[in-house]
Curated annotation (Swiss-Prot):
This is Cysteine--tRNA ligase CPS1, chloroplastic/mitochondrial. A motif ('HIGH' region) lies at residues 95-105. Disruption phenotype: Pale green leaf phenotype. Global defects in chloroplast translation. GO terms for cellular component: chloroplast; cytoplasm; mitochondrion. One of its GO terms (biological process) is regulation of translation. Zn(2+) binds at residues 93, 273, 298, 302. A motif ('KMSKS' region) lies at residues 330-334. Its main location: plastid. Binds 1 zinc ion per subunit. Belongs to the class-I aminoacyl-tRNA synthetase family. The gene is CPS1. Nuclear genome-encoded factor required for normal assembly of chloroplast polysomes. SUPFAM superfamilies: Anticodon-binding domain of a subclass of class I aminoacyl-tRNA synthetases, Nucleotidylyl transferase. Keywords: Aminoacyl-tRNA synthetase, ATP-binding, Chloroplast, Ligase, Metal-binding, Mitochondrion, Nucleotide-binding, Plastid, Protein biosynthesis, Transit peptide, Zinc.
């Protein structure tokens, strides 16, 4: 049964023809670029278990009624687009590019990438805006320290950030605006706030007056008396209230500046996001996201200035991800305890890092450890190896696609489908969605490698159908590689690097062990196996000889087994 699958790419719409049981590689390369709502509908038509459908921007199947935790209401709410049938507007606060991005950034943008993918999986059209704060005190300070132009520095680190996001398979947002390109919009919004008497000018600076905005504190739950000044600098004594924050900063020597009605200067920290979100999504839109450290003061201040500029400004869902912790302390550049994305992916496949991040619910804190990265990497290898073995056997053997699948296969597919959508629709419980793949993967391994499994009726058809459904799940989670074979080789290369060993040396050790076994020197054979296992290289004996694969280093594997 052939089907035309149309996949959206930056260059346009590229039609790809795929067969259900053959020539899959072009299809899953395409699916790695975008969550496949059309593919899911195709699958729904082919097999009854895929019967969930959505129309007019609203899901009809109960498992597909997305519920998201809204920071403002402090509860989960059913997601309803502001305007049914129109695209969903989503704004996520981006990075301040003055240094390499760390895995705290990865946590945030992987989380919102999953939300973006899942909304599209549910057939919503999404306009996703994520900004670059390329004008900021930290950028200026770092540029002065390095003797570099601030815009050159921010461009360099912005490009590095985009490379990091591509490595983590985060889909590009619809728009990625920079503050420096939107100063006119920022100035116009400040004028509106001044006209509405919610701001005041002091010596070329413009401050927002929190006393003139009674709703201040609704998002964070803070009382105004408890709030510290909402800036990244010391309190200015010229403020009417210590919590007043800068909308416009007067120019200082050696800093970039723009002309304005209040004199030369540059935007404050918070106004940029209000102006850019309004420019691209309107004053009212559906979702605003960021790390939980942005709830106050940044997002609290955004709400205040947006409403002061336009009283009808409304954002329906405020969504925030939890921190990445190191030794129970938030990972951040300011604390000096951060690990960069680039440093991690020197030793681990980028999708192992993504798997690690998805293993914890996005709102919960996640503790960064090498041991957990190793577990994620091992889990990823097992998943891709199973799917690669399945792909290989289905490509080289013919299957009869005309007959229905066995009932037990349909049950496994239906169960995965239901568990995946139920967990994802419940505030994006990615850890549960990942766990839902465990049983189908085990079934696939039985069909591939056990004598009983190989004799099962419609074995190839079952393998192919299971692989197709797991591929859809991986795509929505952003874990589908362009090639299983390439990903497996990359995982092997990273394992060798972590073990500080070459593949040639591993092969040599395998040959030494084979010779020892032939000579009945079993103690030496065991020593070689344990020596490699200690550094994360597992030896696999089979009828065709001994091969190796990455694994948890032996002490860590023993610890994991002890826990289970």
């Amino acid at each position: 049964m052939a089907a035309a699958v149309v996949v959206r790419r930056a260059a346009g719409l590229i039609p790809l023809l795929s067969s259900r049981f053959g020539a899959r590689m072009p299809l899953h390369r395409a699916l790695s670029q975008i969550p496949p709502p059309r593919f899911c509908r195709l699958l729904s038509q082919q097999t009854k278990p895929f019967s969930a459908s959505a129309s007019n921007g609203a899901a009809t199947d109960r498992t597909r009624e997305l519920r998201l935790y809204n920071t403002k209401s402090r509860k989960k709410e059913q997601f309803r687009p502001r305007i049914p049938g129109r695209e969903v507007g989503m704004y996520v606060c981006g990075v301040t590019p003055y240094d390499d991005s760390h895995i705290g950034h990865a946590r945030a943008y992987v989380a919102f990438d999953v939300l973006y993918r899942y909304l599209r999986y549910l057939d919503y059209e999404v306009r996703y805006v994520r900004n670059f704060t390329d004008i900021d005190d930290k950028i200026i300070a770092r540029a002065n320290q390095l003797g570099e132009d601030p815009f050159s520095l921010s461009k360099r680190f912005s490009d590095d950030f985009l490379s990091d996001m591509a490595n983590l398979q985060c889909l590009p947002p619809s728009v990625e605006p920079r503050v420096s390109d939107h100063v006119d919009e920022i100035i116009n919004m400040i004028k509106q706030i001044l006209d509405n008497r919610c701001a005041y000018v002091v010596g070329g600076d413009v401050y927002f007056s929190v006393d003139n905005f009674p709703e201040y504190g609704e998002l964070s739950g803070r009382k105004l008396d408890d709030n510290r000044a909402g800036e990244r600098v010391a309190v200015d004594e010229r403020k009417r209230n210590p919590a007043d924050f800068a909308l416009w900063k007067a120019a200082k020597d050696g800093e970039p500046w723009w002309d304005s009605p209040w004199g030369p200067g540059r935007p404050g920290w918070h106004i940029e996001c209000s102006a850019m979100s309004a420019h691209y999504l309107g004053h009212s839109f559906d979702i605003h996201g960021g790390g939980e450290d942005l709830i106050f003061p940044h997002h609290e201040n955004e709400i205040a200035q947006s409403r002061a500029a336009c009283c009808d400004s409304t954002i329906n869902y405020w969504i925030h991800n939890g921190f990445v912790n190191v030794n129970s302390q938030k990972m951040s550049k300011s604390l000096g305890n951060f690990v960069t994305i680039r440093k991690v992916i020197e030793m681990y496949h980028p999708l192992a890092l993504r798997m690690f991040l998805l293993g914890t619910h996005y709102r919960s804190p996640i503790n960064y450890t090498i041991e957990q990265l190793n577990v994620a990497s091992d889990r990823l290898y097992y998943t891709y190896q199973t799917l690669r073995d399945c792909e290989e056997i289905c490509q080289h053997q013919q299957s009869n696609t005309g007959n229905p699948l066995p009932a037990n296969t349909l049950n496994y597919i239906q169960k995965l489908h239901d568990e995946f959508e139920t967990s994802m629709s419940d505030d994006l419980h990615t850890s549960v969605a990942l766990a839902a793949m465990s049983e189908p993967l085990k079934v696939m391994n039985d069909l591939l490698h056990t004598r009983k499994g190989k004799k099962q009726d419609k074995r190839l058809e079952s393998l192919s159908a299971l692989e197709e459904k797991i591929r859809v799940v991986l795509s929505v989670l952003g874990l589908l590689p362009s090639s299983y074979h390439e990903a497996l080789q990359q995982l092997r290369d990273k394992a060798l690097r972590r073990a500080s060993i070459t593949e040639e040396l591993v092969v040599q050790k395998i040959e030494e062990r084979t010779a020892a076994r032939k000579a009945k020197q079993y103690e030496k054979s065991d020593e070689i196996r344990k020596e490699l296992a200690a550094v994360g290289i597992a030896l696999m004996d089979g009828p065709d000889g001994t091969t190796w694969r990455p694994s948890l280093p032996l002490p860590e594997e023993e610890a994991v087994l002890a826990k289970t």
